[in-house]
Design a protein with these regions (language model features):
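STAS-typified acidic loop motif
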Residues: 2-36, 53-55
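Residues that form or immediately flank small-molecule/cofactor binding pockets and catalytic motifs
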Residues: 15, 88, 110
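Long, contiguous secondary-structure blocks with strong helical propensity
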Residues: 16-17, 81, 85, 117
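Amphipathic alpha-helical interaction surfaces in cytosolic regulatory modules
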Residues: 26-102
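Residues at or immediately preceding the N-termini of alpha-helices
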Residues: 31, 109-110
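Short acidic-hydrophobic, aromatic-tinged amphipathic segments that line or gate anion-handling sites
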Residues: 104-108
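Short, charged, intrinsically disordered terminal tails
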Residues: 111-122
């Protein structure tokens, strides 16, 4: 079994928002790393988590599935997910899988942090 090639850094943007910087690959093997980052961010009291995909090298269908799992967990806990830094290729995948309807996608960190703090569609 391969080890996850995913690295994360967690940064508090303000009292309610945390940025999770994601570097490397996002696959099914990334689940422990990303869920751990999610748990740490929520322990810090964040209600809005912004995923920074600027350092993303590769994502496969297992990674998309893992993001859906993360989204379900966030929704159950009344937390919001947003993302920025997606390449055109991965932005298109988010659109094809309709993840962009549940995770707000922004062009950069500044716009992601300034984005709405209330979910758009339910």
């Amino acid at each position: 079994m391969e080890e996850s090639a995913t690295r994360t850094d967690i940064r508090q943007a303000d009292g309610r928002t945390t940025v999770i910087d994601i570097r490397g690959d996002v696959t099914a093997a990334s689940e422990p790393v990303l869920m751990s980052a999610y748990e740490e961010a929520t322990r810090q009291g964040s209600h809005r988590l912004v995923l920074n995909f600027s350092g993303l090298e590769y994502m496969n269908s297992g990674g998309i599935g893992m993001l859906v799992t993360l989204l379900v967990r966030a929704n159950r806990q009344h937390r919001q997910l947003a993302a920025f830094g997606l390449s055109d290729h991965y932005r298109e995948i988010f659109e094809l899988t309709r993840l962009d309807e549940a995770i707000a996608i922004y062009d950069n960190e500044q716009s992601a942090l300034a984005g709405p703090t209330q979910g758009g569609s339910s």
